[in-house]
Amino acid sequence: MFTLTKALEKALLQHFIYMKVNIAYAINKPFPFFEALRDNSFITERMYKESLEACQNLVPLSKVVHNILTSLEQTFHPSVLLTLFSKVNLREYPSLVAIFRSFRNVGYTYEEKNRPPLTLLEDLANPAEGCSLQTLLPPPRPQISLPSHLSSAPRVCDPRATAQPIIEILDEQPSPSPRAVPLLGCIQEGKTTPVSSRDHQRKDKEDSREMPHSPSGPESVVKDDSPAANDLEMAREVPCTPANKKARRKKRPNWSNSKRRRQKKKPRQDEMMGVASPGHGVQEKLKAVSRRTLWKDDSSTNVKEVTKTQRTRMRRAQTSNSQEISKEASKTSGRKRPSTARRTTQVPEKTKNDAVDFSPTLPVTCGKAKGTLFQEKLKQGASKKCIQNEAGDWLTVKEFLNEGGRATSKDWKGVIRCNGETLRHLEQKGLLFFTSKSKPQKKGA
């Protein structure tokens, strides 16, 4: 019998602490989780009643379960896992199945070399309880007896074993040829038929004849009535039987020959179409080339040939990109030309602005009237006499508008000009600053 080691018990405890929250959320109803822990004396009657009262007081069930698991952590024993992952709990709480598998994987890491992985927690059950992990897990399959010349080859004993041995076998034998991958055996309808490579069949024909096809001993016969095992057997029938491989090898040339015949016929038809209509001949030839089957290697499914259609597509993409680049360049060059023309038209305006000296006195015009504007007086208000005409008389803004024939204008800043530009335009540019009383003529009206 297998004895529990401290390392395995410590690993199970650490995993139990790690999975407490997941277990708490997997329990979605109090019964039968609380009752199973109470009946197996893992929690006291007092804790059982307090937990039920907490659930009645609308405390979240996951929090109550987490508190119970925390108390079990202090007095942890692997037998707690047997009660937690019993058949009843796994049926009532389906979310526990994935958690149970994680605990089983922890046991696999600490299993012994000569023991199957499914009997790791064999002695964890209490005999008085009458349950063990053997009732939860399927029994391991017996090993298939092989000839002496195949004893050094890797063996597959259990389809439900971990994936690590299978990965090691694949790493040791990477080539898919029949010499590098010996066929260990085939399972069909409850019978086993061990098959070796072609070299071993030629050397040891007598040994293969002596081996029975339907032995009755437990070592060579593997039977499993479970549906999962039958599915695995049916899935493995196709790659194991050499007859199916031969049939596939025979079918491949027929399929490829029929395809090749079609390919030979299609180019002839395309050539005939090309003579009739030379405009569409190139397109039809490209379609025929794209339709032909690509040659594939038997050892890998990677495509070994690049069709001409892909090359033509690449060339078209390159030409389209070059055309787009040329169009963009022409657009950018076309955009720059009107900007230069605008700059040439704006040059005399800048010379006008540069000639103006924005001193306290500005030459202003309003229609035919001309005068000089004094900014310091204008800041006091538009009703002040701030403009001096050519005769030397001082005028207000309204009087200057009357003299220029623009008395009806309400926007005096848009009428009075200084060197071709209105005072409002100069004010917006920040070249002039006036008082906040912009329209005093309204007050006079």
Swiss-Prot record:
It is found in: Nucleus. The modification Phosphoserine is found at S175, S177, S226, S277. Residues 245-267 have a biased composition (Basic residues). Induction: Up-regulated after infection with M.tuberculosis. Residues 1-108 form the HSR domain. A motif (Nuclear localization signal) lies at residues 251-266. The keyword Iron-sulfur does not apply. GO terms for cellular component: nucleus. It is linked to Defects in Sp110 are a cause of severely impaired resistance to infection by M.tuberculosis. This is Sp110 nuclear body protein.
